[in-house]
Amino acid sequence: MFTGLITGLGTVREVSSVGGGKDARFVIAVPTGNAEWSNIAGAKLGASIACSGCCLTVIERGDDAFTVEVSAETLAFTTLGTWQPGSLINLEASLRLGDEMGGHLVSGHVDGLATVAGATPENGSTRWRFIAPPGLARFIAPKGSIAINGVSLTVNEVQDRNDGSNATEFGVNIIPHTAAHTNFSALQPGDKVNIEIDMLARYVARLQSFPHG
């Protein structure tokens, strides 16, 4: 379990194929000079780390990097399939008992991919707009929580596009600190991002799908 508060910006160092070429192994370098990640060599094998919102298992670790393996399904349904050496990765270690709950509960199970529609300056911050993936728009509500590339954010508005596409667009505000310490700084219109909808919205929708009585 995670909170959506990114504690470091990692970099993909190596990418290799495993499992007959369908799965992938990534070596991710942790940020230097960051106390949160200075002891990655001491991380337990099997530990969970959220990498741009996707919960991954540490299978190897060294002085300044850790290694994860990713299945073909995860590669196909998340941004991980586009990772290459140099890609910037939002990092968060799993929540521990007693840690501050500063964001919202994030499982690290990506629900789908949203598309960057654009970004505009707004009163010192930046309003980012995304096109929601089909089937997930109904879970996204104004003032609700959403994780984008693992970052806990509040939805500002949700609106249907009037361009005949039947797509739904939603917006969030990113302050300069968040932009500087996450991979939002590298996003461009048309890019895909991992999103995880709020757990409460997911369970409410599931309950409503059953007959009342």
Predicted regions, residues:
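Conserved loop->alpha-helix
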Residues: 1-213
